[in-house]
Amino acid sequence: MSLIATVGPTGGVKNRLNIVDFVKNEKFFTLYVRSLELLQAKEQHDYSSFFQLAGIHGLPFTEWAKERPSMNLYKAGYCTHGQVLFPTWHRTYLSVLEQILQGAAIEVAKKFTSNQTDWVQAAQDLRQPYWDWGFELMPPDEVIKNEEVNITNYDGKKISVKNPILRYHFHPIDPSFKPYGDFATWRTTVRNPDRNRREDIPGLIKKMRLEEGQIREKTYNMLKFNDAWERFSNHGISDDQHANSLESVHDDIHVMVGYGKIEGHMDHPFFAAFDPIFWLHHTNVDRLLSLWKAINPDVWVTSGRNRDGTMGIAPNAQINSETPLEPFYQSGDKVWTSASLADTARLGYSYPDFDKLVGGTKELIRDAIDDLIDERYGSKPSSGARNTAFDLLADFKGITKEHKEDLKMYDWTIHVAFKKFELKESFSLLFYFASDGGDYDQENCFVGSINAFRGTAPETCANCQDNENLIQEGFIHLNHYLARDLESFEPQDVHKFLKEKGLSYKLYSRGDKPLTSLSVKIEGRPLHLPPGEHRPKYDHTQARVVFDDVAVHVIN
């Protein structure tokens, strides 16, 4: 039985807002800042403190809000990664944060001496905002830069306060952090640290500008080309996989924000939730789950295996839509399960994407969200002269709406696979259009990245040893870039281009060991888009094309 039931915020179904709009809303932003201040200032043993809420995800590996402690717990966080419960466990996780945040906001609102009724109403309407990195990777300055933010004080006057969205201050550093190097000495969360262990925000902004196009491309393909739960939900190997999973794209954001020259908090699963940006990030992950569910209305959680042990699920346990999502209880001894989580209204929230669709049929909602995905994430190909390939790609992404014939196109990807735990830390693989040793670091050479979000763990990490052969895969989609130089996506044209242009990759990690398990393939899969259809389909009557003779060089 839990001491805190997970029921979501009160006051009916309200929208979680894009952080870009949220920071412009005086009342919401003021209440959010003040509420974070309140939760972050609480004693770290308080179950409703920011520290305890963040600690559910990873360290300090203690039970959260349990009336009676369990025996023989598996020493890990509660979070589920690399398995089919990844999206739904995090849905309940966000909900408990949101309800406690709203409670703090109501407490804050009652301190206002003027227009108190309006402030209390705003607090009741407050929901956790999201960072739509698939559309606009650079968040507002209030999230990434500003040491102080402007809010409205209790007397109605404007004031400047320290920004609680930028970092969390540990008070104190928890003893459980001791085996984890720099994390045992950093007094605050740190993003993109340099070799001197200092936060490097200019470097992070540079990375965001570089990766924005490929993150949008991955988001689009993830939503459009994964129609089975096992392929959509997590970054493990799945049969007939053609696009990155929701978790894989999620991993990219964690590593981008957290990993600089060394690991920062967002880059390590045990520490990530202590960074306030984690909650903006994961709220968008949940929003993408809602979009995907809308265009796949009859698909939900399937069965699988929990490779990694968690505090709530034993290692290698069979899991499915009825698996208890510890430590989140609806009431008494009734634990939330994925089967109850398809409808976000049960938890008191929605997203603006669905504003005009309430009460609509599932077919109407599916088509409307399909169009929204095309418009928001189906970005036009990179700048260049308009050509046949450009027009064809625009048709497939719904940028042009009218097509009367069955359109056909090859979908070209760099298909990457590796042992996730081989290097004992998080790492990144960055790919470039460049020959071996070529001029690879210019923006127009960058193609994309694949990231392993796993963090450094002590040598005694049983979970790491149990999963040392666990394979992770990822995809970098090339058509977006090929369209600026080629007239077609036919194999002979793409093959000639890649042979002449060259492909290289660079491994970014703290050590100097090579990634010996790495497999890189250039693949083309035939697509077709039937007349009047919104969603491209893979043409299984034709074989995929694999270029075995296109060398992918290593940049040292």
From Swiss-Prot:
Family named by the database record: Belongs to the tyrosinase family.
Subunit structure: Heterotetramer.
Site residues (Cleavage), renumbered to this chain: 378-379
Swiss-Prot/TrEMBL keywords: Copper, Melanin biosynthesis, Metal-binding, Monooxygenase, Oxidoreductase, Thioether bond
Lineage start: Eukaryota, Fungi, Dikarya, Basidiomycota, Agaricomycotina
Domain of life: Eukaryota
Propeptide: 379-556
Pfam families attached to this UniProt entry: Tyrosinase, Tyrosinase_C
Annotated protein name in UniProt: Polyphenol oxidase 2
EC class of the enzyme, as a word: oxidoreductase
Gene that encodes it: PPO2
